[in-house]
């Protein structure tokens, strides 16, 4: 986007080849838009349901391979994650595996995990009408001057 090859709607303005066999195409951009919109809309709707602002979020932990390879600044620049949270984003690797290992060897941590699971609320975003509306709104990319906000 910084190079002007992708507009704010996600349209690839010209082909982009990294090498003769590795290139970026419109389908790649669309897949990114779908993921970006889902994450951005999910954050907005969950904050709305809890009655908080994104600025109130203390930490953002990104787990798994996604977190290992995610560049936080780029995720904020494209609107996937709120820019206000940039300095609070941490990649934590294989959180599920590490949590299972800790719970397996530490009874106290196992009990804490159970208590946390019992008070965790499941939200079915895919069935939420507001989520669908925000999801569609989040498909585009911020214009260049919005990246730093």
Region annotations inferred by a language model:
Residues 1-149:
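Helical "lid/coupling" subdomains associated with nucleotide-phosphate turnover
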């Amino acid at each position: 986007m910084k190079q002007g090859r992708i507009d704010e709607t996600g349209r690839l303005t010209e082909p982009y080849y990294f090498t003769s066999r590795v290139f970026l195409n419109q389908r790649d951009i669309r897949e990114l838009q779908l993921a970006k919109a889902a994450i951005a809309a999910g954050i907005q709707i969950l904050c709305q349901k809890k009655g908080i602002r994104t600025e109130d979020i203390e930490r953002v932990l990104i787990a798994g391979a996604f977190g290992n390879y995610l560049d936080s600044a780029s995720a904020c620049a494209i609107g996937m994650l709120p820019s206000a949270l940039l300095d609070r984003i941490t990649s934590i690797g294989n959180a599920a595996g590490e949590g299972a290992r800790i719970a397996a060897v530490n009874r106290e941590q196992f009990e804490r995990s159970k208590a946390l699971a019992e008070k965790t609320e499941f939200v079915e975003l895919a069935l939420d009408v507001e989520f669908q509306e925000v999801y569609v709104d989040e498909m585009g990319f911020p214009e260049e001057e919005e990246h730093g906000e």
